[in-house]
UniProtKB/Swiss-Prot annotation:
Species this protein is from: Saccharolobus islandicus (strain M.14.25 / Kamchatka #1)
Binding of GTP, residues: 103-110, 185-189, 245-248
Annotated CDD domains: SRP54_G
Organism lineage: Archaea, Thermoproteota, Thermoprotei, Sulfolobales, Sulfolobaceae
The entry's keywords: Cytoplasm, GTP-binding, Hydrolase, Nucleotide-binding, Ribonucleoprotein, RNA-binding, Signal recognition particle
Gene this chain is encoded by: srp54
Subcellular compartments: Cytoplasm
GO cellular component: signal recognition particle
Protein name: Signal recognition particle 54 kDa protein
Amino acid sequence: MLENIRDAVRKFLTGSTPYEKAVDEFVKELQKSLISSDVNVKLVFSLTAKIKERLNKEKPPSVLERKEWFISIVYDELSKLFGGDKEPNVNPTKLPFIIMLVGVQGSGKTTTSGKLAYFYKRRGYKVGLVAADVYRPAAYDQLLQLGNQIGVPVYGEPNNQNAIEIAKKGVDTFVKNKMDIIIVDTAGRHGYGEETKLLEEMKEIYEALKPDDVILVIDASIGQKAYDLASRFHQASPIGSIIITKMDGTAKGGGALSAVAATGATIKFIGTGEKIDELEIFNAKRYVSRILGMGDIESILEKVKGLEEYEKIQKKMEDVMEGKGKLTLRDVYAQIMALRKMGPLSKVLQHIPGLGVMLPTPSEDQLKLGEEKIRRWLAALNSMTYKELENPSIIDKSRMRRIAEGSGLEVEDVRELLEWYNNMNKLLKMVKRRRGSIDKLFGGKIG
């Protein structure tokens, strides 16, 4: 799946096929690749319908070529398919923090317990593992081996068949030993199709332990079948989250991810390999970047991000012109950085309406700030303190000398930046006064 879509992106961006035909071919390849990854057919066609709808309704930003804009829409909609902007919180909300892992037989739950313990140990937490899977004979030995490998203590009672009793004793022991995070590996005796029994058992252990987090472990190879299990789990345990394992060993990973995301459940981690450190926090946008080929779309995403940041600053400029708030050198810095992300300044400035108002300068054409001047100004801004950026009026000759020395510039460079900043504020006040005069002339505000 990943390779096919990545190749399609590269072909689309570099090929000479006419735009409309290239879009149709790409959409067909996207549908084919997603369906072969076991993504639900309805979800696939809903996705491509949304892409086409946006293509027809929206106008491409001036800083993006049409093909770049199309790929940015594909990226956005695919990200929504796999969970959108939801960023899972992996930090414990209290200490000790008790995590209970559940999952059907063969899901990779015990291995994931070890990976999770290693993840938190690397972050500086004291971690303990509780082996409460009493139905699989090798579960305790496997967890003990993992614990020894990563230097994490394991509590277990190989001759005790009471999972709840073991779990409670293990948690109590680690609480007394002042462990920060306690991970309980519960039984995985039920197979897929026996979700009801699994969830009933989960509730029993939950009531006994009152854990702070319940995590369901799902094998990616079940593809879209993950929907039923994730849906029931999400309804039974709203505080719970999900780990999808074995993403590296199946073509159905996309199907499992999209199915779980469709339930509204939070995907916290994905397992990306067999090694103990191959567990990563799930981020839908990062995952989609990988699918589309990070090298091919990185510059597009950078331009889109720059445009979004620029529009935020532009909104603030408009507020200042309306007399709301003030513009600081911190805003100027953010504006320049946003423009740099959108491409070469000489090209970007030509495509931004009203930039003469946004970036006025007394000595050059308002639409063409030189790269060298921008470089010097950024160096000066980087050498200023927080107070100086927020309140430039405090910058006297002594501060100018310090800023110049810290940035490798002349004092005149710093003075020029401050003059430009002051002229910009004067211009904004003029615009505000002119707007006020027009409002009075017409008896009120005009849109």
